[in-house]
Amino acid sequence: LEMKPSIDASSYWGLRGRETLGETGYVRFVLESGFEGDTGRVANDTRSGALFSREAMVVLGREGTGEIALGRMAGFLGSTGTYAQWAATGMNPLASNAPDAALAGVFQSSPIMDNAIVVKSAPMHGVTLLGQFSNSTNQATYPESEGFSNTEHLYALAAGWKGENATALLAWQMIDYANTANGAQPHNAKPTHNIFAGASRGFGDLRVHVA
């Protein structure tokens, strides 16, 4: 028997701020750092001791139009981060991040990425559109200075819908691997494409999830 921290949901702390620009504009920032509840050790990053490794970004937006975010953030296929669409659309059937009880144990999830940009629309008839690009998913492994072909990139699109008692999500993610051998990925590894489609609807006390 072994007890481990942060299996269901990561412990984290951080700073957030927002400033209004004009009547409907705004700029805000997010700084979040994950940590293990039993030791206090920084978590959510492969780089030991990296501060604000969960999220570090600045967001510029306008109410009713949408927003653009720049910095370090998680992808759409997951439940961690501001733009995680599994959480935003309630796709996890047990509302858990534990691998044996969550989508991450079955479907490909998204990494937390450096040098990322997200464009998000305001909801239109319940539909929210998002796009994401990362120029170098992990600066520690793939320094941006090595050039475009020698860094790992991520491209993603997502459309989420929220109704009165139902939600749906369609997302596509492509990881373009670096043109260098690294771990399990050989030299000139082909990109991976992941498509996720899911829906959830409540029927009284019963909720059905399909993905």
Question: Where are the regions that the model predicts?
Answer:
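Sequence/structural signature of outer-membrane beta-barrel proteins
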Residues: 36-40, 77, 134-146, 150-153, ...
